């Protein structure tokens, strides 16, 4: 239903912009993180940093491949980072050759969805006011995703599931609008 909205109204409903005290539209923190440029983001959140590394066992090699938000040749925002990293993670997942009944190949498996959700959750639940950034490290078949901030539910609630306390609910909503998480 939002496809017919004007851009400003769409961004307001998405919570990417809001009216400031002068009545003009300004980006929200969530909007800045999701759609902004890294150099603007770091004006507000100086420790903002997104880092994806593919490492190996050879200590002489720091990494085999790296994407980070300060490269300068892409936006450095969390949505573009998500898309770039998801592509790298997806490429490593083995997908058996199976056709659906309509003849099309199944090209995604549950592991794709789990990796996508883990990355989106790390980005949506991060404490961007913290002292460090988000780090995703792939080493062989292992993947480590860490973000600044502590978990906001009890250990029991975490393991039981179903009780979320998002640190950045508007970022979570934005991921939801692109069918992630």
PLM regions with names:
Residues 171-173:
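C-terminal lobe/lid and adjacent interdomain/linker elements of RecA-like ASCE P-loop ATPase modules
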Residues 1-132, 137-166, 177-181:
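Active-site helix-to-loop segments that bind/position phosphate- or nucleotide-bearing substrates
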């Amino acid at each position: 239903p939002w496809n017919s909205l004007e851009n400003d109204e769409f961004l307001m409903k998405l919570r990417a912009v809001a009216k400031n005290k002068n009545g003009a539209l300004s980006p929200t923190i969530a909007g800045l993180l999701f759609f902004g440029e890294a150099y603007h983001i770091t004006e507000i959140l100086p420790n903002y940093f997104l880092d994806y590394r593919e490492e190996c066992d050879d200590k002489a090699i720091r990494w085999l491949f790296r994407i980070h938000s300060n490269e300068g040749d892409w936006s450095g925002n969390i949505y573009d980072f998500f898309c770039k990293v998801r592509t790298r993670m997806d490429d490593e997942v083995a997908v058996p050759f199976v056709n659906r009944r309509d003849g099309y190949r199944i090209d995604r498996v549950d592991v794709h969805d789990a990796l996508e959700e883990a990355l989106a959750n790390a980005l949506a639940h991060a404490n961007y006011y913290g002292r460090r950034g988000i780090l995703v490290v792939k080493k062989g078949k292992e993947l480590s995703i860490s973000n600044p901030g502590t978990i906001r539910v009890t250990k029991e609630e975490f393991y039981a599931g179903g009780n979320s306390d998002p640190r950045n609910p508007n970022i979570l909503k934005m991921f939801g609008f692109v069918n992630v998480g």
